[in-house]
Structure formats: structure tokens, C-alpha cells
Amino acid sequence: MVVYTNSRKVRTTRKTNVKLILSQHDYKCGTCIRSGNCALQSIANELNISEMPYDSILEKDNWDKTFPLIRDAQKCIKCMRCVQVCDNIQGMHIWDVVNTGSRTTVNVRANKNIAETACTLCGQCVSNCPVGALTERDDVGIVLDAIENEDIITVVQIAPAVRTAWGEDFGMSKEYATAQRLVAGLRRIGFDYIFDTTFAADMTIMEEGSEFLERLPEIKESGLPMFTSCCPGWVKFVKSEFPEMAGRLSTAKSPQQMFGAITKSYYAEKLGVDPDKIFCVSIMPCLAKKDECTWDGGKDVDAVLTTREVERMFKAFFIKPEELDEDEFDNPLGEGTGAGVIFGATGGVMEAALRSAYYLVTGNNPDADAFQSVRGLEGWKEASFDLNGTTVNVAVASGLGNTRHLMNAIKKGEVHYDFVEIMSCPGGCINGGGQPYKEDAVMVEERRHVLYGLDKRDNLRFSHENPSVKQCYEEYFEKPLSHRAHEILHV
């Protein structure tokens, strides 16, 4: 039997199907952020569709535009990818097919307002939407307003995972799209100070690692672990799905929030300025970070931009990153270690914490790769390590579906851990909902290799050896878990 896959009949049928999809899609490509990187646009171009014989029937929806995740109903093509990833990978069941007949569409389950659901803002639905019907709330405008205000000092921090992906849409290789070229571009846009969230990741390790060692006797007695608190998607998840476990979270702020708190206390004092004059911006691979900066406890961070938003800023400023010379982070909040860099990959927080916990217990550094068994993209990993005669059982999970299985096993007493790291996005922050759009898992593996390569080549691979962290404690916080540290760096 001969099967023809590109006959006139097949081509006509494909074109008709795509035209029918387009008839329910707002194809104003010139104003769509997915233009040039849109599956539907690509197919329409490949099929040479130049006219539409059908009238457009576009869905109307009143979406809360203040929510960090935005849905444009007129762009939705009912492909069900958001439903599939939310149900089958993340297990959150936020999206569903609603209404009947010609009014059938995809929307929030039970026609709820998105803010009323258990949505963690992991953003995996956004990453998998092929047409731009789901996007992040654009906060570029308020950031540019702050930059142009001469009375405001703009400070920006760059998350570890961002350096693995920011150059992808510009066609830059991983080796060329360095954090230093990103710094150069941001300086051209007009930020006053450009720092590295890796510094705050090292601070987080000092606080969280010390907290773990302090809580370890109680952990052993209760049989319940301490959980990391770096991922706001995970924090929202545990509070809504397993509220009885919320008290097991580390009290240390996430690196983003810790950086903001340090900027508006220690750094403001060093500059001799009113903290209210500082506008702190985060560049994150994540939608949930936009929500985290609004949580109770003070306005540590004023605005969060995703990696994609920064790419659009570069294009709006006609910046060609491939032509930029490298520039260095500002100090003292711009110095990080390899331990802080690997925060962007699943298992990275755990490995970094164990490196410094070993030092805090023994007074000696372990081999920097002694805890690498927690690395990898598996959804749920576990390991046991000896800390000066005490066996520490740890687990690492990424993806909320895997996390739910882990949490249920802990509740049932099927597994017992002392320390657990959770990231809401499969693979960790490198696969965050604010990263450049990807078509396969290969890109995630490449991003992971970038982080571990940076760690391997770094002269400093232990958070406790970061000289800027030491300086910060000597000049302001005294020591991890001090009274001032608890007031400013913990919730």
C-alpha cells in the first residue's frame, strides 16, 4: 500500500483545518509576543495561507489583568496542552474544558476566577501554550518608569537559571551568552546597580543550612523533615494542599526576597540612602516570583521580570547582545560561588546546603562533588550522607505531580527524610515558566549542564567561602541566625 502524505487532497485538507483554527484565533501577529516563535503562525506560513474565507468568531473573557498569569481568550485554539501539563505533569487540575456546543472552550475549572484557585503559578501551562494565549503579566513598563525617575536608585538582580537561557531567542550559543554580557545589556538600558542573585543564594545557604543543623535533633525525634523554602510555587502548593506540613518549611526567605531585604537594609546603609529610594528589580525564570514579591512581610522586591520580558526589553532598546562586550557585576552583592549557581537546577539547593552543612559540623570542606548523587532530572531522588557520625537522609523532588507523591508518602510514614528540597517546575528553575519557549527536553538538559559547568570552573564552590557573604555578616548580620538575621532574612 502506498500512502501519500503531501498530495493535493492532503494539502487542501490541512489548509482547511488550519483556516478553521484561525477563524477562532485573534491572528493579529504584529501585536503578539509570540510572533516569530508561534507554532500556529509557522504552520500557516508553511501552508501558504494568505486569505481567510471564514468569519472570525472570537471568545470574550473578563480576565483579572493584575494576576501574574494572563489568559487571552481570543488567542486560545483549544489545543488542550495547558490542561494536559497541569493535569498529568503537575497534578493541579486548574484548567478544564468548559461550556458546551459552539461555546466550548478551555478555561479555569468550574469557571472560577484564577485567583480563587490553587494555582501555584508554576507557569508550565504558559511554557506549553503554542500561540500566546497564556503569558506572564508584563511588568516592563513599571521598571522603565523607575529607571527614568532620577530620584530613584534602580537595583537589579539576576537569578542563576536566567544565565542558562537568556540568549536562546537571539541565537547565541551557551558559551557566548554569558551572565557578563547580560550585565552589559542591562547597564545600557539604564539600571544603576546590577547584582547577582547567586550572592543571595549563598546567604540563603548560610541561613538555611544553619537552621537545618539547629533543627536536626527535633527532626530526628519527630520523624518529619525540614523543607526548603526557595520556590514560591512549592510554598503555595504546600500551604494549599498539605497545610499541616507548612510548619516544616525553612523560615529562611528565598534568595530573591533575601536579596531585596539585604538591599534595603545593609546596602541602603552602605549607600547612605533612604531604602524607599531604592527600586529593587528581579530577573527570574519564574511567574511565581511575581506573586512572591507581594506576600506579607514587607516590600523587599518591587518588580519581577521573567527571562522573556528581559529579552523583549533588549529588542525594544535595539540592543544586539552578540555585539556586547562583557561587563562585571557590581559589588558587594554581585559575588557568588558555584554552590549558589547550581540553585537553578533540581538538587542544587540540597547539594549546596550539604556542602556548607558538612563544613559547619566538621570545620573542614568536603570534596565539592561529594553530594552529586542528588543531581539529575529524575522527578524524585533520595540519598543518605554521613555528617560527622550522623546519618542525614535527604530527598529531592521537582514537578508538583512528583511532589504530591512524595508528600503523601511522608504523610503515610512510608518514607522518612531529614531534609527535603522541592522545586515546582520539572527539572527546577532552568525549566521555569518564565524561561524562553522550548520544544523539547533537550534544551533543559543543556541548561542544566551550563550551571554545573559554571560550578565546576568556579574557584569558590562553597557558600561559606564567599568573601562578600563573610563581609555582610561581619559588617551587619554578625552570624547566621542572629537576632538581626532572623528579623530581616527570615519570615
Which residues does each PLM region occupy?
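Iron-sulfur-associated redox domains of electron-transfer enzymes in respiratory
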Residues: M1, V10, R14, E136-V491
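Fe-S ferredoxin-like electron-transfer domains
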Residues: M1-L121, S127, L134-N149, I153
